[in-house]
Amino acid sequence: MYRTAASRAKALKGILNHNFRASRYASSSAVATSSSSSSWLSGGYSSSLPSMNIPLAGVSLPPPLSDHVEPSKLKTTTLPNGLTIATEMSPNPAASIGLYVDCGSIYETPQFRGATHLLERMAFKSTLNRSHFRLVREIEAIGGNTSASASREQMGYTIDALKTYVPEMVEVLIDSVRNPAFLDWEVNEELRKVKVEIGEFATNPMGFLLEAVHSAGYSGALANPLYAPESAITGLTGEVLENFVFENYTASRMVLAASGVDHEELLKVVEPLLSDLPNVPRPAEPKSQYVGGDFRQHTGGEATHFALAFEVPGWNNEKEAIIATVLQMLMGGGGSFSAGGPGKGMHSWLYLRLLNQHQQFQSCTAFTSVFNNTGLFGIYGCTSPEFASQGIELVASEMNAVADGKVNQKHLDRAKAATKSAILMNLESRMIAAEDIGRQILTYGERKPVDQFLKTVDQLTLKDIADFTSKVITKPLTMATFGDVLNVPSYDSVSKRFR
């Protein structure tokens, strides 16, 4: 057997050598012929090869692409159980599919406290049909990427891969969301990571204060922490997560959104997997009331971190929510050192009037946190402790200046352009496009055209900005401070600085 194989190998080697010599001979003669003249180096034509400027005979050129490409239209289907499937085609070779749920920390009752945070970490773990190892291998086999995100009002699970693997993407995604196993050892492992994450939270003062303004500024559901409190960790188990999912992951509160997928093709795959979800009426959103308040945590150190925030309308008041977004861009801000490159954000209001004028500011930036029916607009700052009182007063004076109409048209035009470019550049990402589809349908019941958003931004005037800011700063103040807070003025004295 081995000799036969060897003789065949020798014969094959002889054929290959013969062909290789013929190839070398042909190549050599071609090179010799073409190199007989160097006119092609100076732009002339080769004597033996056709010019690339002359179309090949018998080859028809394809028609040129159109200068204008019609944007893809959103297609939606609502299953009998109330679940919505929405798709938007794109020319990209890859697709992004997400399952978005109207469920977040606002739906946590005391027995479920911290469940949203842990659910985010338990995404794409073992299911009733797959081990975590098998799940990872299947995702790797199609070159996919998965992610999960949790917020106060919504949960999102996404998968991204080439379009040819849409059935596999859908099956893995739905199995992970519908059939999580919540194995004890996996839950305990993620709880250990949650504890580490909570411990590291104190090293992120801005993130810590953004959580604090919610707990201090609201009473009710929006005051629930997005991050699991340490006191709740011992009560989180696989059974708790299972009950939370059973109560909240119902068909009428889910949207499956996709970017880069044919709608009919997706529908054929999704419908058998999701049509049996229970048709439970969508519950009323838990109530929250903005009240304002004061939060202080003294940890010492060489800096004072503070956040001043006010209530703004939510996304259901679309125009005013857009004004809040433009106002955030107008105020801008950043750090005393621009890590994003020279000039980044240096024409914004806070940069020009605070960071450039007062070196005691290490950072100062505007932020928004907008929900369906309410939201927050505020300014975060970090200064040296001895400058804390003056720094807070300066921030208040800048808010008053905007309310008094001190913003000029140049500032507003720059903020409007920055807002539009940020939205349009984000929507170039298929993952963000799919997320935008899912979250808008959960909020509005439809996806509003981006042109409508851009038109609203274009129509904003200086008076709109001034009137909006004037109304906002009359609401109760929410103030949160962290670090060396000994020199931070009282809540009442800061409140009085806003007219």
Curated annotation (Swiss-Prot):
Provide the topology term for how it sits in the membrane: Peripheral membrane protein
Q: Which UniProt keywords are present, listed alphabetically?
A: Chloroplast, Membrane, Mitochondrion, Mitochondrion inner membrane, Plastid, Transit peptide
Q: Where in the cell is it found?
A: Plastid, Chloroplast stroma; Mitochondrion matrix; Mitochondrion inner membrane
Q: Which GO terms describe its molecular function?
A: metal ion binding; metalloendopeptidase activity
Query: Gene3D superfamilies attached here?
Result: Metalloenzyme, LuxS/M16 peptidase-like (3.30.830.10)
Q: Magnesium: present as a keyword of the record? A: no
Does the record's keyword annotation contain Mitochondrion?
Answer: yes
Record's GO cellular component terms: chloroplast; chloroplast stroma; cytosol; mitochondrial inner membrane; mitochondrial intermembrane space; mitochondrial matrix; mitochondrial outer membrane; mitochondrion
- Single Gene Ontology BP annotation: proteolysis
Tell me, what does this protein do in biology? Substrate recognition and binding subunit of the essential mitochondrial processing protease (MPP), which cleaves the mitochondrial sequence off newly imported precursors proteins. Component of the ubiquinol-cytochrome c oxidoreductase, a multisubunit transmembrane complex that is part of the mitochondrial electron transport chain which drives oxidative phosphorylation.
What family classification does the UniProt entry report for this protein?
Belongs to the peptidase M16 family.
- Which PANTHER family does this one have? METALLOPROTEASE (PTHR11851), MITOCHONDRIAL-PROCESSING PEPTIDASE SUBUNIT ALPHA-2, CHLOROPLASTIC_MITOCHONDRIAL-RELATED (PTHR11851:SF194)
Subunit record text: Heterodimer of alpha and beta subunits, forming the mitochondrial processing protease (MPP) in which subunit alpha is involved in substrate recognition and binding and subunit beta is the catalytic subunit. Component of the ubiquinol-cytochrome c oxidoreductase (cytochrome b-c1 complex, complex III, CIII), a multisubunit enzyme composed of 10 subunits.
Q: What is this protein called?
A: Probable mitochondrial-processing peptidase subunit alpha-2, chloroplastic/mitochondrial
Could you read off the lineage of the organism from its UniProt record? Eukaryota, Viridiplantae, Streptophyta, Embryophyta, Tracheophyta
